[in-house]
């Protein structure tokens, strides 16, 4: 794929697809959801608190945008270490309404950190259509505001997603 074993992925509050995109054990994944001790987080994390450090998945939390600044810290550490690792930060369109996301985007751009932000825009959040919450359907405008390279793709097309991550992480 497009990630190295040492890259780090930070999921959002609905991150089953994020962790399933990595080289994880499906048995351990489903065991976690069922609360079994042989799960990814020993059955203690459940669906919204998955963690698999061995495969580069550094967590998901039920707090909208909760892992975004943590991913930024990971990217900062990679830059300080001088390696070529990147952080992947997943979030939904509602996360774009959180102040911490704007602070993170600004700092990532200012410091030229090795991070790729993936915004899954399904046009709904908090039971509201995006038109009732934001002045534009496009969450990509926040990348423009922070001078961050962006690529808009159909998230259901895995080849487009892989190509976009490859382009943005190089």
What does each model-identified segment do?
Residues 90, 117-118:
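Residue-level marker for buried hydrophobic side chains located in beta-strands
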Residues 119-170:
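Thiamine diphosphate
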Residues 1-111, 129-135, 140-147:
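Cofactor-binding active-site loop characterized by glycine-rich and histidine/acidic residues
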């Amino acid at each position: 794929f497009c990630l190295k074993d040492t890259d780090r992925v930070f999921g959002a509050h609905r991150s089953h697809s994020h962790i399933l995109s990595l080289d994880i054990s499906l048995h351990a994944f489903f065991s976690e959801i069922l609360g079994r001790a042989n799960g990814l987080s020993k059955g203690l994390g459940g669906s919204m608190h998955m963690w698999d450090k061995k495969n580069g998945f550094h967590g998901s939390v039920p707090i909208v945008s909760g892992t975004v600044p943590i991913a930024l810290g990971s990217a900062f550490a990679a830059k300080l270490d001088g390696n070529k690792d990147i952080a992947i930060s997943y979030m939904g369109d509602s996360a774009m309404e959180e102040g911490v996301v704007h602070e993170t985007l600004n700092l990532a751009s200012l410091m030229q950190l090795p991070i790729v932000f993936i915004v899954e825009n399904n046009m709904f959040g908090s039971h509201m259509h995006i038109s009732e919450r934001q002045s534009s359907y496009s969450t990509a405008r926040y990348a423009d505001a922070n001078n961050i390279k962006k690529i808009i793709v159909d998230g259901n097309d895995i080849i487009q997603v892989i190509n976009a991550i490859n382009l943005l992480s190089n």
